């Protein structure tokens, strides 16, 4: 029995409440594949679902990679760690490729509003960034370059079409700056991007409407936290490398 759009959306909401994010992602993938432009609510459900699905694998990958490094003297343990890490990597890559296919095939081509276009291009940058975290060699170069390209395109549209206080524009600046810091190892560029976004938003705080006030100020706080952390790390202090992301 094929479910219609409203039933799939309802299923996604139920799955979210039950914290069954794989089910939530499957439901929202089916909604997307129907080929209509998503509403803001549907867009957010899709984003939350995949963010949790991929987030669980990114977190597992970091834990196993760290354990793998600590077992260098024990070949058997290290081999087991390596195999398990590769299993998680394969899952993570499948998820990212799923999202990237939805973006290229449906979401980006169907986006009529600049806000949606920026949202989806940011998402494209994010999922190529997640791929680049686990990639190596030529594959890494390709994913890094694709990520930067998507972020850059989103960034240019956002500067032209959106207020500096818009939560999507701020979220993009946050993640693009994390990309510069973590993936390109360019702390100066990361700090400059984050600081500019923060300062421009502060200067226009009075343009914030009530519904996005909470979202915007939360992201501004994350931008400021990252700036504080990155500045202290570059001055040689041992900082906690837990960058905030949107």
Curated annotation (Swiss-Prot):
Residues modified to N-acetylthreonine: 2
Modified residues (3'-nitrotyrosine): 84, 106
Highest taxon above the source species: Eukaryota
Modified residues (Phosphothreonine): 2
Post-translational modification: The alpha, brain-specific form differs from the beta form in being phosphorylated. Phosphorylated on Ser-60 by protein kinase C delta type catalytic subunit in a sphingosine-dependent fashion.
Subcellular location: Cytoplasm; Melanosome; Vacuole membrane
Position of the Glycyl lysine isopeptide (Lys-Gly) (interchain with G-Cter in SUMO2) cross-link: 51
Residue(s) at site: Interaction with phosphoserine on interacting protein: 58, 129
Family matches, as InterPro entries: 14-3-3, 14-3-3_CS, 14-3-3_dom_sf, 14-3-3_domain
Residues modified as N6-acetyllysine: 5, 51, 70, 117
Alphabetized SMART domains for the sequence: 14_3_3
Modified residues (Phosphoserine): 60, 186, 232
Gene Ontology biological process: negative regulation of DNA-templated transcription; negative regulation of G protein-coupled receptor signaling pathway; negative regulation of protein import into nucleus; positive regulation of transcription by RNA polymerase II; protein localization; protein targeting; signal transduction
Purpose of the protein: Adapter protein implicated in the regulation of a large spectrum of both general and specialized signaling pathways. Binds to a large number of partners, usually by recognition of a phosphoserine or phosphothreonine motif. Binding generally results in the modulation of the activity of the binding partner. Negative regulator of osteogenesis. Blocks the nuclear translocation of the phosphorylated form (by AKT1) of SRPK2 and antagonizes its stimulatory effect on cyclin D1 expression resulting in blockage of neuronal apoptosis elicited by SRPK2.
Similarity comment: family membership: Belongs to the 14-3-3 family.
Quaternary data: Homodimer. Interacts with SAMSN1 and PRKCE. Interacts with AKAP13. Interacts with SSH1 and TORC2/CRTC2. Interacts with ABL1; the interaction results in cytoplasmic location of ABL1 and inhibition of cABL-mediated apoptosis. Interacts with ROR2 (dimer); the interaction results in phosphorylation of YWHAB on tyrosine residues. Interacts with GAB2. Interacts with YAP1 (phosphorylated form). Interacts with the phosphorylated (by AKT1) form of SRPK2. Interacts with PKA-phosphorylated AANAT. Interacts with MYO1C. Interacts with SIRT2. Interacts with the 'Thr-369' phosphorylated form of DAPK2.
Name of the protein in question: 14-3-3 protein beta/alpha
Protein source organism: Homo sapiens
